[in-house]
Design a protein with these regions (language model features):
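N-terminal beta-alpha lobe that positions the nucleotide/phosphoryl donor
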Residues: 1-273, 277-296
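A short, polar/charged loop-to-alpha-helix boundary motif
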Residues: 230-237, 297-305, 422, 553
Length: 571
């Protein structure tokens, strides 16, 4: 089947990735954008672009609007990317009803794997091990009772969707009610459904996932595994293919479990079957946690070690081609290592707290060279928005040799070459992860980043391997400068002094005028107010939640710095 056009129902780096893959197959591509996202680079990379009604993520989640855009632009296929509508069975059904091919799994598979409780039941039926848990949406009372049975800790998860949103661990019974409410709120905002379920929490586990692809003729194969144990608050930050230091016999058992599960469901398109490997004991027990019925953010590392273009493969399978047509009847053998580091626009506090960084990029120069790939959408002058995810780019490095330490060093060096100015990014944080002995020795687990976040959030100490604008601009401080001509290093000393002066940026906090003797508490970020949890006259304690603000798809709690009485609430 040849598509007349492919509409990409997404934005940013993944929309660009899909557009290029489709264009290389000779397909016409159409981008969509919300009214406040017209300046995003994906609108220029695609052959055409159509504006959606509405602002922010809501526009990209409007099924009728996306279908109408496809019909108006003459597209008979839609690629959803990841996030947004990618895992909504309702959207796949709407595409079918409109005579448009949904490039992804069937609506039935989306419905099954989009309901994490049903997916657990299906895993058990396929003889795939799962964590102890409750296979349905639970109430707060049920979650509290489950915690009572497992006081070592439980994890609350959104019943729909993934990406770490609506997912939090509970290790203290006193925190359960607040965390439960936060998970429900995040799940509702991200997926439109507030339902959550619970499982036993594994504090020392590796996250291993298997890449599956199935065609419409009943054939299914795998493309190896990835390790995604480097996570901050259940969100992946660094991914690896293949998983280093994984016992070969264990690797094969996990892959066989994923393939068996996919075959039991006659799975079609790309899919990722995810497992936790318990490292607290023998390190040989694994459990299924979820299947993501879509293209993954980290598909890139699998591409680099197998040489298979997963996006093109997904499009071709949707067009009716078989795995044999794609030369994928037999699993591809990985070569070397690939590492992906997610570069986010954010500011990290000394305590590891994270705030999204919004504003204008004044410089954007990604690294390059052999074995260095960057999937991003930044450019000089791009103005970001808190309405969307903070991911700016993915730096992917690959090596041909089976030397994981060398791959780590290469990834760290590539990040020092990434010039991002005007906004804060997490490159130092990523460099610290990649250079840490635990990471290089492949001995980390899913809580490792959170346990070491204060160390990882500190400046990396690595030298930036790029020239900033200030180093070469006219009037940079040399003209008319007085230096000691007898000192051969005087110019360098003067240059360093001028750069230090430029870097001294004064941050102006919001000024809140309140009653005499009161101290204002302001939101440290721009965003949408989710809730105000204090009223005039309330007595509050230090650390007590006062409000919740949502920005870049994550909720941030604003807490009191000290005990006091609320005298005024302003918005």
């Amino acid at each position: 089947m040849t598509f007349s056009g492919v509409l990409i129902a997404n934005r940013g780096e993944i929309a660009i990735r899909i557009a290029r893959a489709a264009q290389d197959l000779g397909l016409r591509t159409v981008a969509v954008y919300s009214q406040d996202d017209a300046a995003s680079l994906h609108t220029q990379v695609a052959d055409e672009a159509v504006q959606l009604e509405g602002l922010g993520a809501r526009a990209y989640l409007n099924i009728e609007g996306v279908i109408a855009a496809a019909q108006a632009s003459g597209c008979d296929a839609i690629h959803p990317g990841y996030g947004f509508l990618s895992e909504q069975a309702e959207f796949a059904t709407a595409c079918a009803n409109a005579g448009i091919k949904f490039i992804g799994p069937t609506a039935e598979h989306l419905g099954l794997f989009g309901d994490k409780a049903r997916a657990r039941e299906a895993a058990i039926a396929a003889n795939v091990p799962v964590l102890q848990g409750i296979d349905r949406a639970v109430t707060l009372a049920e979650a509290q009772a489950f915690f009572g049975q497992h006081p070592g800790g439980i994890i609350i998860k959104a019943l729909a969707g993934g990406g770490g949103r609506g997912t939090r661990a509970v290790t203290n019974a006193a925190d359960l009610a607040e965390i439960f409410a936060r998970c429900q709120s995040e799940a509702k905002a991200a997926f439109g459904i507030e339902d959550v379920y619970v499982e036993v929490f594994l504090p020392k586990a590796k996250h291993i996932e298997v890449q599956i692809i199935g065609d419409e003729h009943g054939s299914i194969t795998h493309l190896g595994e990835r390790e995604c144990s480097a996570q901050r608050r259940n969100q992946k930050v660094v991914e690896i293919a293949p998983a280093p230091a994984l016992d070969e016999e264990l690797r094969q058992r996990m892959i066989e479990a994923a393939v068996r599960f996919a075959q039991a469901q006659n799975y079609q398109s790309l899919g990722t079957f995810e497992f936790l490997l318990d490292t607290s004991g023998s390190g040989s027990e694994f459990v299924f946690i979820e299947a993501n019925a879509r293209l993954q953010v980290e598909h890139t590392v699998t591409e680099e070690v197998t040489g298979v273009d997963l996006v093109q493969s997904q499009i071709r399978v949707a067009g009716g081609e078989s795995l044999s047509d794609l030369d994928l009847a037999d699993p591809a053998t990985p070569r070397g290592f690939a590492i992906q580091a997610r570069v986010n626009l954010e500011t990290l506090g000394a305590d590891g707290s994270v705030l999204p960084s919004a504003g204008t990029l004044t410089a954007y120069e990604p690294p390059s060279g052999p074995g260095v790939r960057v999937d991003g959408f930044g450019y000089n002058g791009y103005q970001t928005s808190t309405a969307f995810d903070s991911l700016l780019a993915k730096v992917i490095v690959s090596t041909k040799a089976d030397n994981f330490a060398a791959a780590c060093a290469k990834a760290g060096r590539a990040l020092t070459e990434f010039r991002i100015e005007g906004l804060s990014a997490n490159t130092d944080f990523l460099q610290n992860i990649l250079s840490h002995t635990d990471f290089v020795e492949a001995s980390i687990h899913t809580r490792w980043v959170d346990e070491n976040v204060q160390t990882l959030a500190s400046p990396s100490g690595q030298r930036n391997r790029y020239v900033s604008a200030q180093q070469g601009e006219p009037g940079d401080g040399f003209a008319g400068a007085r230096v000691d001509t007898s000192d051969p290093l005087a110019l360098f000393a003067h240059d360093a002094e001028m750069k230090n002066r430029r870097s001294e940026v004064v941050q102006e906090a919001a000024v809140i005028t309140g009653p005499d003797g009161s101290v204002g508490v302001s939101s440290p970020i721009q965003g949408t107010t989710v809730s105000v949890d204090a009223a005039v006259g309330d007595e509050v304690r230090a650390g007590q939640q006062l409000a919740v603000v949502e920005a870049m798809k994550m909720e941030h709690v604003i807490a009191a710095d000290f005990d006091g009485i609320v005298r005024q609430v302003t918005m």
